[in-house]
UniProtKB/Swiss-Prot annotation:
Activity regulation description: Repressed by steroid (4-MA, VG106, PD91, PD17, Finasteride) and non-steroid (AS601811, AFA27, AFA76, AFA131, AFA192) inhibitors; steroid inhibitors are generally more efficient.
The protein's Enzyme Commission number: 1.3.1.22
Membrane topology label: Multi-pass membrane protein
Record organism: Solanum lycopersicum (Tomato)
Catalytic reaction(s) noted: a 3-oxo-5alpha-steroid + NADP(+) = a 3-oxo-Delta(4)-steroid + NADPH + H(+)
Keyword Magnesium appears in the UniProt entry: no
One of the GO BP terms on file: brassinosteroid biosynthetic process
Bilayer-spanning residue ranges: 11-31, 47-67, 78-97, 110-130, 151-171, 200-220
Highest taxon of source: Eukaryota
Known role: Involved in a reduction step in the biosynthesis of the plant steroid, brassinolide (BL). Can use progesterone, testosterone, androstenedione and campestenone as substrate.
Official protein name in the record: Steroid 5-alpha-reductase DET2
PROSITE patterns: S5A_REDUCTASE
Length: 257
């Protein structure tokens, strides 16, 4: 079907970019039933959330490393530098975050079909991100590399810190027992899902650092997936807590949306 690696690479980039649109539309009407949106009636076979997160995010580590070593630029220090933020994020998401979940005695309520779907997406995405950085990026003729990398890294790093902090707040509330509570403090005073805002910022920074269609496709798909889910989270909080929930909060972008 594909006459060359470049054709395969371009097809996957195009596929992810195009799939962002139907994903965004679908997410207006259907919220994936995990986390606070879990319902046993809609979920089918379920597994432990820590196992689900470790499984579905795992290609972002092992496949990234395998593909990276196959690229013509894998010995280039700039390629190592560029892939590092990506690996930092997914080390947290694949290893550290599941361990933090495990310590909270979570129930087996993560749908297996969602974990498998996310695993497949991460296979495709890890391939194109690692392949671009290690093989197709032209470091020798990129005069703006350091400018874009510096600005992108600031955005990425700020988003990652926000994402980790917000996850910590939510996990801390869960560990208190007694059901869901209203998260407060920091950006939780402005949006219902600062963890999603942080992740959107990360992949905006990544798209800027890589300056590639692969990075852009990932950022666009992230927005298509997380923005509607943030809106669903916001509606869920309003329905659950009613008048007690702060009315000035937005869903994901402070003061805007």
């Amino acid at each position: 079907m594909f006459s060359s690696d470049e054709n395969l690479f371009n097809f996957i980039v195009f596929f992810i970019l195009v799939m962002a649109f139907p994903t965004f539309i679908l997410c207006q009407f259907f919220t994936s039933p995990y986390g606070k949106h879990y319902t046993s009636a809609d979920s089918g076979t379920t597994i432990s959330p820590p196992i689900a997160w470790a499984f579905m995010e795992s290609p972002t580590l092992w496949l990234t490393i395998i593909v990276f070593r196959l690229g013509k630029n894998y010995t280039n220090p700039l390629a190592f530098l560029l892939i590092s933020p990506y690996l930092f994020h997914y080390t947290n998401r694949t290893i550290i975050y599941p361990l933090r979940l495990r310590s909270r005695n979570t129930k087996n309520n993560f749908p297996l079909n969602i974990a498998v779907t996310a695993f497949i997406f991460n296979l495709l995405n890890a391939y194109i991100q690692s392949r671009w950085v290690s093989h197709y990026a032209n470091y020798q003729e990129d005069d703006w590399f350091w400018v874009r990398f510096g600005i992108g890294l600031v955005i990425f790093g700020s988003g990652m810190l926000l994402n980790i902090w917000a996850d910590g707040v939510l996990l801390g509330l869960k560990s208190q027992g007694g059901g869901y509570k209203i998260p407060r403090g920091g950006l939780f005073d402005y949006v219902s899902s600062p963890n999603y805002l942080g992740e959107i910022m990360e992949w905006l920074g990544w798209a800027l650092m890589t300056w590639s269609w692969a990075g852009l496709a990932f950022f666009v798909y992230t927005c298509a997936n997380l923005v509607p889910r943030a809106v669903s989270n916001h509606k869920w909080y309003l329905q659950k807590f009613g008048e007690d929930y702060p009315k000035n909060r937005k869903a994901v972008f402070p003061f805007l949306y």
